[in-house]
């Protein structure tokens, strides 16, 4: 085993995809600077229940397949929420980098109830009250192992309040 081999799971945000600018920039950066790191970019459903299930399955599979290699998680927006959920419920072994993570998406989703089409994949889905309740059940009020998280926050995000993330991850390495 080459100890430098590693894997990063990238979890995109709501109504996004592995084809988003952030995901593509990360893929290009790793290919150029860290070719020994394999980036895993699953396409997550817009439906929260399916996205959570997909993220859990991919994460668990990577943990099993690459037990002796580095595994990290990067999550952007809703993907940041999912990354925190994975580390808090399945395994806190990996480290995570969160980019403007959604902290309480169940508080934002009421504004998104209804029909949606993912602009990258053309997936059509409906966000319903049951989806919001499911996400609320996975709300994380405190971080068990804050040293596992590095958080990058942008103050000018139109949707996400960076101060919520700054407060939740106050004991983690945060960059505003």
Predicted regions and their residues:
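Active-site signature of alpha/beta-hydrolase-fold catalytic machinery across serine-
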Residues: 85-89
